[in-house]
A protein has these predicted regions:
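Membrane-lumen/periplasm interface segments of specific transmembrane helices
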Residues: 28-29, 33, 255-326, 363
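Membrane-interface alpha helices of multi-pass inner-membrane proteins
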Residues: 201-220, 231, 264
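Perimembrane helix-loop-helix junctions
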Residues: 225-263
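Hydrophobic, aromatic-rich transmembrane alpha-helices
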Residues: 93, 320-347
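Signature aromatic-anchored transmembrane alpha helix within multi-pass, membrane-resident enzymes
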Residues: 187-188, 201-202, 395-429
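Membrane-interface micro-motifs in multi-pass membrane enzymes
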Residues: 56, 60, 109-157, 217-219, ...
Length: 586
């Protein structure tokens, strides 16, 4: 593996044609976010998530480990985002290294530039990027670890192939290795017996499982990334490479061996997590969308699940750019699978293609709930792989045109590569837009909170409990920036289709993002029974008495504020406590 990384660095990653575009796209997408302070949901959650027991009770002890090792404090936005960008660039480079090993070490730098840049700019990551406590640092680091573990495993596979098939090893690195290592293919006469190599293989697979344990213990959305990437490896090795295995079942046995580290990691995760709960005397709890909903599933809920998934990951392509890119990639990938099936006279490309498609929504298959965009990070890997496949196709056109001395294929191939780079830039621009909007949301909320806190400190007795009621709004400008207006044909069509599917009123504007640009004020005074609202106010330099109240406990205070006719930003001294209306009471 060390020699592979050195070779890849010298021939690909160290070339200006690779790292200059990588830096250009990365800082175009994330530079503003890294260099500007933004406080949002979860950002002040370190005292609860890491120092307290929230993540431990949710079996996310790996996330605690990440924060303890790589972050320093409750809210260090520049450091967390800087490290996140570093991990994300390393993850993109590791993903390209994986492709470099898969394709027989082709030295076409632009292939890997497109794969890396399209991966790290896919805009769905904006849903978790600003969560500097729970997502920003952890997810990019997990991506990097998973890709490096798979590079290591694939290195062992190709090394095993080389030792078991000297003729194939002698043919040179330019020809793809035959996909029979760690599988049940027919052995070469010089190959050692399976009984002799099995202990070494088992040790490698178990070691990979141990390394992956803290990674999949960070968040539920990480394990599907491993599954999707493994299926991509199998698809490329057994459907794209021209050499075919000696046994049709070779792909299955290789897939089983890739599954062993994941199963090992899951088992170790549960053993360690429940051991921690037992030692600390804690109970298992769920935070966020982590519950298994299949147990209470009925026909009506199942229909709602199917409709929700179809709307979010199909119909939404009419208005939501990252979903548009995903749907186009999915359609083109499906056509590629069909063509490969016809050409190879085998159903394997279609079968593995379906498996890849299902793996993208593995969270829904496991939990029985509509997959939120913030957990749909498998789409980043899938779309980057499809971009890479078409970059390969365009290079094939260029080579064919040069060999046959025809200008049109060369021109078409080069235009195709430029188009992929352009779409990658559009992804970066879209990502930057919503991260910048989130910064504007922070500026607006900061102005509101500073004015409210100053008024309280000068005109009221702040030793009394402060009760915050209502739902904050960032105003019409922010609303129309994060919702589809319906004025375009695509927007109007989306609303009509959505209405026919689930009955949502046509006038209701759909969100373009689910997590980004969400109100920090609402989060801190509602979530975790308002236990973080005091921390939120202290962030602005004020130490007030803010009691922790559950949603149910807030209801009578909301009703009281409505009865008083309070408007947004009104303050009322009620004798024993002070009511602060921060938004709509509806």
């Amino acid at each position: 593996m060390h020699s592979l990384i050195k070779e890849y660095t010298d021939k690909i990653a160290g070339r200006k044609a690779y790292w200059i575009p990588l830096l250009f796209y990365t800082f175009g997408a994330y530079g503003f976010s890294m260099l500007n302070r933004t406080l949002g949901a979860d950002d002040l959650g370190t005292p609860l998530y890491v120092n307290d027991t929230v993540w431990l009770q949710d079996l996310r002890w790996g996330a605690v480990l990440w924060k303890k090792l790589f972050s320093f404090g409750s809210f260090v936005p520049f450091l967390d985002k800087f490290l996140s960008i570093c991990f994300l660039m390393l993850a993109g480079t590791a993903f390209s290294c994986l492709l470099y090993l898969l394709n027989g070490k082709r030295e076409r730098v632009l292939l890997y530039t497109i794969a890396s840049c399209s991966f790290l700019t896919f805009p769905i990551i904006c849903e978790i990027w600003e969560f500097t406590c729970g997502g920003t640092l952890i997810v990019p680091g997990d991506f990097f670890c998973i890709f490096m573990i798979l590079v290591w495993l694939l290195c062992r596979i190709t090394a095993s192939e080389a030792s078991s098939n000297p003729q194939n090893a002698a043919s040179g690195a330019s020809s793809p290795a035959r996909p029979q290592a760690l599988s049940a293919g027919r052995r070469h006469p010089r190959q050692s017996s399976s009984a002799a190599i099995l202990p070494q293989q088992a040790a490698v697979l178990l070691a990979a499982g141990v390394l992956m344990t803290p990674v999949i213990s960070s968040a539920e959305s990480i394990a599907p990334v491993y599954v999707t990437t493994v299926l991509i490896i199998l698809f490329y090795r057994y459907c794209i490479q021209r050499t075919s295995p000696e046994r049709k079942s070779a792909w299955f046995f290789e897939g089983v061996r890739f599954a062993i580290p994941l199963v090992t990691a899951f088992a170790l995760r549960l053993i360690i997590a429940y051991s921690i709960l037992a030692v600390l005397g804690l109970e298992r709890k769920h935070t966020g969308a982590t519950r298994i909903e299949w147990f209470g599933m009925n026909a009506e809920k199942f229909a709602a699940l199917i409709k929700g998934m179809f709307i979010n990951y199909g119909v939404a392509s009419l208005i939501n750019f990252p979903i548009t890119v995903f749907v186009i990639c999915a359609v083109l990938f499906a056509l590629r699978c069909i063509l490969l099936t016809i050409r190879r006279r085998s159903a394997l490309p279609v079968f593995l293609g379906i498996c890849i498609g299902l793996s993208l929504f593995l969270i829904t298959l496991i939990q029985g709930s509509v997959m939120l965009y913030r957990t749909a990070i498998t789409l980043m890997v899938f779309c980057a792989f499809v971009f890479y496949l078409f970059a390969e196709t365009f290079y094939a056109w260029i080579n064919a045109g040069i060999i046959n001395r025809k200008t049109l294929p060369v021109l078409a191939g080069r235009c195709g590569l430029v188009f992929l780079l352009f779409i990658t830039w559009r992804q970066a621009a879209h990502l930057h837009r919503f991260l910048a909007l989130n910064n504007l949301r922070y500026d607006n909320e900061t102005a509101v909170m500073q004015e409210i806190c100053y008024t309280l400190s000068t005109d009221y007795d702040t030793s009394k409990p402060l009760i915050f009621v209502g739902n904050f709004s960032n105003g019409d400008a922010m609303y129309y920036s994060t919702h589809d207006s319906g004025k375009t044909r695509a927007g109007a069509m989306y609303r009509k289709i959505r209405h026919k599917i689930d009955g949502t009123p046509v006038w209701k504007s759909p969100l373009l993002v689910q997590s980004t640009v969400s109100s920090a004020i609402d989060f801190y005074h509602e979530e975790f029974d308002g236990r973080l609202m005091g921390e939120y106010i202290a962030y602005y330099g004020y130490d007030f008495n803010v009691p922790a109240l559950s949603r149910d406990e807030h209801i009578p205070y909301n009703e009281e504020a409505a009865g008083l006719g309070m408007k947004p930003f009104n303050i009322a001294d009620r004798g024993d406590y002070i009511l602060i209306c921060i938004g709509s009471l509806d």
